[in-house]
Amino acid sequence: MISRLIHSKHYLTLFRQNSSIAIPLLYSLELRCRSCGIKVQDKNKDEPGYYIKPVKLLNDSKTFSEQTQKLGLVVAADAPNILQNPIKKRPLDEAYDKLISKMSQSDKDLLINDFTLFGQPKYKDSKELETIPKNDKGETVKEVVNKIYTVKPDETSVECMRCRNIQYQSSYKMTDENFPISEMEQVLQNLPRASTAPLVYLFNANDFPMGINPNIFKFRNPKDIYFIMTKTDNLVADIKNKFNKSAILHEYTKNFVSDYLGIKYGVPKQNIFLSSSLKGWKLDELHRFIPDGSYIIGNTNCGKSTMIKSLMLNEELQNKKEQVRHVPFNTVSKIKDKFKQQFYQKVGPGVSYLPGFTRDIIPLNIGLKTVYDVPGFSSSPKIHYLYESIKEPKIIHRLIKGEKTFAKGYNGAQYKSFKGPQVLCFEGLGYLQLPKDCLFQIRNVTNFKIHAFSNIDKAAKLAQNIPPSLANDFAIGNHSLFSQFDKYLVPPFYGSIELVFENFGYIHIKPIGAKQSNELMKLYLYPGLQSIIRQPIINYITKTPTGFDKYGNALMKYDPVYKSEFALKRFRGGEEYQPLFSRLIPCVEDIEKFVGGGGGGAVAAAGAAAGAAETNIVDGNDAQGLAQSLRSQEYLQLNQFLKRRAKYDESYYMDASNKYDFWVE
């Protein structure tokens, strides 16, 4: 019957016209993991998609113990579902049950201290038990509410062992097979009806605009893509009403994102939505915003599955709201909280901070709409290496969470000052080398723990053998800074910038005092971690001091901030266009030219120069000459990479008029 249906012309017409019906039908023909979407199998536990088949689905009559012995392992959470033979009770439990069965209901409640119902005394004696309001089925109000807020089990729902081990044991192997991550082009080409299906593109507020791959516009017209910024609560505070400050900041942020996507790519403003699944912002509006039959796409860890699950939960809660309208809030509140927790665990796609958790397309119904959760993509081929190297899963979870801009990144937030040639270590995942004798204020809008070293040579030596006292300041184990890390030059800049780390947040960098040299900052990144620099995002999402008073006069540095006029910066095109961000410049290794061999590139050369000067291995003139040669080599690499007439060197003067001349998007 199914074979005839699939090959019939009627079915093919249905498939073309309504994918939201056809795709779930096709997926229902195969047993798949509800968390990651992979097709499951129970033959080989070393192959992807392995799961433990419930005993009731097996055709033989072996007992539970024999089945589990054959399978080789037992999952405690599965036991209630697959248990066939009852477990014999202990004598102590049998005696307890016998005594309990002889007690009245009031004595049972007294035993467990259950004195209250809806905040009032439940009953004083057994006669009062008969006066508790019940419906025609003999159910109390509390029992009815519990029944309403019960997650109904799906008999056909299964989970593969990879997903169960991640969820219950935090156990995983970060391999390409277990966590497949493809490039965007490959993911889009694998979508059914790839040329016409609606696309909803999610991107992360923590690292904007890194989460937007411009190649998406090779597959769709900008007017046909819907963009959703996730984790927006990290940029603006919670929204209470349209008149408070948070709502105004939310509007500023939406205008900024709309300006950027509209000017850069031609995306209409009505195709942009700002959301926070954690805070549950405007979920009803978000549901209306997403077209029926949409494919939800985006980078890994951008929050696709979390958003979908929040929409599913909101739909369930709305359906139940009318049923408990007359029940006191205190009665419903705790039961509803328990329901939410169970819903997140048992319904919808799995949610994880690990990249590549979703392994195949998962069709999901949200009200009358059907959407498809699509595996995330990445432009970094070494992303598995990055996450596999991090010591503990809880560290990944902490770093992915990000920080709040209006707690750590605004102009009045706490900062720390550092002076070059100090090196800032971001838990071993990145090292930022500051130019010599230059002073900077650093605001940390990530969850990185920052440790400062006096120079790059000392940082490299300690990284090879991390002492126990600093172990908690490193997300990875011992490593070789000179040979393992990717090296980059930070393009020249004027004024404040932000160093953005993909998925993790950003570091606000503000130069202080007179500029001592044109030496470039250098950033060393662990393989798989990507970074850019950008203009301070705070200038675009809230009004900031202009540095001029109300008469247009420039203020002095020592003038109080309140004398300044405040203005909101807008992202503009045309002659007023300024690049929002810049890529970093790859640093080519050429150590032999400077120190006569030894390997390790310009990073090692810089460390050698700093170490030699401090330990008097060479005299001051030789160390100074070596450092100058290194800077000249870096200037040459910068100019060659940009292929521009403007030549950056020691004498180049930067100001507000040319501060973006060396930025490349």
Curated annotation (Swiss-Prot):
Write out the function statement from the record. Answer: May be involved in the mitochondrial lipid metabolism.
Pfam families per the record?
Answer: MMR_HSR1
At the top level, the lineage of the source is: Eukaryota
Q: What is this protein called?
A: Genetic interactor of prohibitins 3, mitochondrial
The chain's transit peptide is found over 1-17
| Keywords associated with the record | Mitochondrion, Transit peptide
* Record flagged with keyword Transport: no
Indicate the segments forming the CP-type G domain, all copies.
Answer: 185-380
Q: Which SUPFAM superfamilies match?
A: P-loop containing nucleoside triphosphate hydrolases
- Family matches, as InterPro entries: G_CP_dom, GTP-bd, Mito_lipid_metab_GTPase, P-loop_NTPase
What family does this belong to? Belongs to the TRAFAC class YlqF/YawG GTPase family. GEP3 subfamily.
Q: What is its main location?
A: mitochondrion
GO MF annotations for this entry? GTP binding
* Compartment annotation: Mitochondrion
Gene Ontology cellular-component terms for this entry are:
mitochondrion
